[in-house]
Amino acid sequence: MIKVTLVYPFFKPFYDNSLFRFPPLGLGYIAASLKRRGVQVELVDCTFLSREQAVSRVRQSKPNIIGFYSMFSMKKTTMELAALLRNDCELLVVGGPLPTLDPAGYLDIFDVVVLGEGEAAMTEIAECHEKGVGFSDLDGVAFKDNGLVTQTSPRKQVEDLDSLPFPSREFFDNEAYKQHYLKRFGYSISPLITSRGCPFSCDFCSRPVFGQSFRSRSAGNVVDEVEEIAGLGYDRIWFADDCFTLNPKRLLGVCDELVKRRLNMSWECLSRVDTMDHEVAVKMRRAGCLRVFFGIESGTDKVLDLMRKQITVEQARKAVYNSKAAGLQVGAFFILGYPGENDETVLDTVRFASGLPLDYLSFTLPYPIPGTSLFERTKCNDCFVVDDWEEPKNMALIRHKLLYSSGFSEAKLKFAIGKAHIQFYGKRFLGKRGYSFVGSPFERATDAVFKLMR
């Protein structure tokens, strides 16, 4: 019987200081799909391993096929590990966001690239290899034919997500993941994906694998997996969808099912501000939601339009206040210095963000991800450094590194981020009265300094 070993090359040495570590659900889905078709499978999650340990585990599994997951921050480690294991298998396969966008960039080492969703493709690749036939009749793959890169027709996306088996979580080091979070936050959290695809077209967002077609699992199917995760000893769920609240009817169905089953599992999620009204927020809280995160990104409608966010500042304000009124903790993400911004729009965002009743906020500089409209507009600028995406140790810094020519200097934007954090935490700890005495002069002075900076 043919054997497949799947590898997630997210190495421990690069991420010892990382607060957030999640198991590779995508490979978990592929492993479960292979098992369902009778294929022998192993999964080596390198998150808590050294490179030497990872190589040893893969070799011990004695696979016919090795399949890698790769993304923007993993290309270098993926290629290095694949080169080490080239002679330990008959076939090397890779998939994920970056291979889907740039299959040719992987085919000097890999034999086959999976384009898009991988469950059916990887199963069919294994079956073809076992039969000794080629891959030209498969949809959604790329390979070299006489030295030339060949891409087959796109594969149809999985429409019925309930038809997929749950990820094979037995391959993950669940105890290590639980202890990682218990030591840092006092609770253990595990991700769960309830939908695929996003119908929006934000300027900075890349969707190479799941695309724009939104597909979702049924409420009962979702909560069945919540029960499975609870049985593994986790006490919190991270709904890892791009926007968990996109379909209000389904969302409320999930909430009702969670309440009905009395699982005592808390959870958190990402949301869009235009989907969060008071009724939704209240039902989410009653169903165990503790925290919701919004990608607000800017405090001006002009910049939101540049980003193609299809939201307004007023919608963002209402969503935050609706969530807080329901008893939810609220986090928000903002970008400073977006192409087309000026000093006033940056300061407007700083004022808006620091004035919201948030529990958590994050500011980043614009970082152009391959496959996005933002990337296409900025990649020709002289100071754009694509290689930074391929160096894992740089990823902790990438959100605060200016990767392209801009009307703002990196130092000026970092000053704005520091100013925003001081204003935000100053208002939280000093209160309105205390901050009005100390904070107003600070804001005026730092506004002036910011405008003078280049």
PLM feature spans:
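Radical SAM enzyme core and accessory elements
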Residues: 2-6, 35-36, 40, 51, ...
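Short glycine-rich His-centered loop
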Residues: 2-19
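Glycine-rich beta-alpha loop elements in corrinoid/cobalamin-binding modules
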Residues: 2, 20, 26, 30-160, ...
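N-terminal [4Fe-4S]-dependent radical SAM core
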Residues: 10-12, 138, 144-194
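Radical SAM [4Fe-4S] cluster-binding motif and immediate context
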Residues: 22, 167-333, 351
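Flexible glycine/acidic-rich beta-alpha junction loops that bind and position SAM and/or redox cofactors
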Residues: 13-14, 102, 146, 248-249, ...
